[in-house]
UniProtKB/Swiss-Prot annotation:
Residues annotated as catalytic: K285
One of the GO biological process terms: glycerol-3-phosphate catabolic process
Localization in the cell: Cytoplasm, Cytosol
Record's catalysed reaction(s): sn-glycerol 3-phosphate + NAD(+) = dihydroxyacetone phosphate + NADH + H(+)
GO molecular function, one term: NAD binding
Similarity section: Belongs to the NAD-dependent glycerol-3-phosphate dehydrogenase family.
Residues annotated to bind substrate: K196, R347, N348
Function: Involved in cell redox homeostasis. Required for maintaining a steady state cellular NADH/NAD(+) ratio through a mitochondrial glycerol-3-phosphate redox shuttle. May function with the mitochondrial FAD-dependent glycerol-3-phosphate dehydrogenase SDP6 to shuttle reducing equivalents into the mitochondria for respiration.
The name this protein goes by in its record: Glycerol-3-phosphate dehydrogenase [NAD(+)] GPDHC1, cytosolic
Domain of life: Eukaryota
Disruption phenotype: No visible phenotype under normal growth conditions, but mutant plants have increased NADH/NAD(+) ratios, decreased levels of glycerol-3-phosphate, and produce constitutive high levels of reactive oxygen species (ROS).
Length: 462
């Protein structure tokens, strides 16, 4: 298994006994809260093996995995995903550049298969390499070894905590499957969603469905037991012990003890009650990150152009959240930082850059080899569809007649025309920024904060 608790403790601050004791105390405290008996381990499963889901599982394994009688974690991913030859060759280079990884694989009698894959004599599979600590979407950052399960029923049937590491586009389908295995459950699991994105429903009235709501609807698990963990975070950097903050959002019953349980010296987790704003912002930041990548590529990384884009896109985000919530969390602190880091760096920003540079094209879809699902693409379509409904019309001060809310979001409109209808090229994002008829972003924020356009029906509320 992974390095001992003592080794982990020494890395923290050199105090082996003290830090190890604190970890065990935190684990025992959380186990007591769940009513776990002495010989019944806390069981956590991460569903989905993208970069962040894999890193999240690895962080918990490294923290608590040494207490084997008290803690178990496993990760589920689908079987059958082959590793292509190019990735296998690169993975072999990564392994041989890291003496610690090389020694670990040799010790586990796992090195030879990577040699054979490098030579083209063997096909590796994503679930197979994940057991050795290699996430297919992040092979440059080896993780600790993980217990990988490819049978969904085996993975989740007795889990105390389920971590949703799936894209929002897959969340409902997988959790509907999970619900079949929980029909005989007596205890109610806790679910932590890492997913960013939304679904749009138009009946009986136009409204959005966030991943936590999808999970609640699919499983019947009370919404108080479904929480959202938001950044700012870049998965590889967090695993490499870059200092990071996060927020776990939801009902007080679980968010406060979970924040304490998840907190690490380099990964500080705060708790927050505003589930809606954080989850919606989680989807919106991916939308606007694609545009940020385009602007960066098209302007040769112009700091001025990127700052103009940042001003306009954040004002649109604030406008949209004020449609959804009467008093949304302010776009400040960790919430602003999460937006900033996603626009600065991440797979959605990368996708926008590569599109603008012509190194990838829209016909390749939104699932990219080595990167995984580009969740911002589907989110563009969902937010546009929702905000273009005439039944939600608003009357901005400069308009003489009501218009759909999307008319106050020129960047969102442009991204829709670039990514979804494909009627415009990536250059259109710059044209949208340079439109002389655009209002000061502050005007959009002031209108939003007047509460004049609040639409509770957008969350399916009366």
């Amino acid at each position: 298994m992974v390095g001992s608790i003592e080794a982990k403790s020494l890395q923290s601050n050199g105090s082996v006994h003290h830090i190890g004791l604190n970890l065990e105390e935190k684990l025992d405290e959380f186990r007591r809260l769940l009513g776990k008996s002495e010989k019944d381990p806390l069981r956590i499963v991460s569903v989905g093996a993208g970069a962040w889901g894999s890193v999240f599982a690895a962080l918990l394994q490294e923290s608590y995995g040494g207490f084997r009688d008290k803690f178990q974690i496993r990760i589920w991913r689908r079987a059958g995903r082959a590793v292509d030859r190019e990735t296998a060759e690169h993975l072999f280079e990564v392994i041989n550049s890291r003496e610690d990884i090389l020694r670990r694989l040799i010790r586990r009698c796992a090195y030879l298969k990577y040699v054979e894959a490098r030579l083209g004599d063997r096909t590796l599979y994503a679930d197979e390499i994940l057991k050795d600590g290699f996430c297919l979407n992040m092979v440059d950052t080896p993780l600790c070894p993980l217990k990988v399960v490819t049978n969904l029923q085996e993975a989740v049937w007795d889990a105390d905590i389920v971590v949703n590491g799936l894209p929002s586009t897959e969340t409902r389908e997988v959790f509907e499957e999970i619900s079949k295995y929980w029909k005989e459950r007596i205890t109610v699991p806790i679910i932590i969603s890492l997913s960013k994105g939304i679904e749009t429903a138009l009946e009986p009235v136009p409204h959005i469905i966030t991943p936590t709501k999808m999970i609640h609807q699919a499983t019947g698990v009370p919404i108080d037991n479904v929480l959202y963990l938001g950044g700012p975070n870049i998965a590889a950097e967090i695993y490499n012990k870059e200092y990071a903050n996060a927020r776990i959002c939801g009902a007080a019953k679980w968010r406060k003890p979970l924040a304490k349980f998840l907190r690490q010296p380099h990964f500080i987790v705060w708790d927050n009650s505003d589930l809606v704003t954080h989850e919606v912002m989680g989807g919106l930041k991916n939308v606007y990150a694609i545009g940020a990548g385009m602007v960066a590529a098209l302007t040769n990384e112009s700091a001025t152009s990127k700052s103009v884009y940042f001003a306009h896109c954040t004002s649109e985000m604030i406008f949209i959240t004020h449609l959804l919530a009467e008093e949304p969390e302010k776009l400040a602190g960790p919430l602003l930082a999460d937006t900033y880091v996603t626009l600065l760096k991440g797979r959605n920003a990368w996708y926008g850059q590569m599109l603008a540079k012509g190194e990838i094209n829209r016909d390749m879809g939104d699932s990219i080899s080595g990167k995984g699902m580009i969740q911002g693409v589907s989110a563009v379509g969902a937010f546009y569809q929702l905000l273009s409904q005439s039944s939600l019309s608003i009357l901005p001060s400069e308009e003489k007649k009501p218009v759909a809310p999307v008319e106050s979001c020129p960047i969102l409109k442009t991204l829709y025309k670039i990514l979804i209808t494909r009627e415009q090229s990536t250059q259109a994002i710059l044209q949208a920024l340079r439109d002389e008829t655009l209002n000061d972003p502050r005007d959009r924020i002031e209108i939003a904060q007047s509460h004049a356009f609040y639409r509770p029906s957008l969350l399916g509320q009366p």
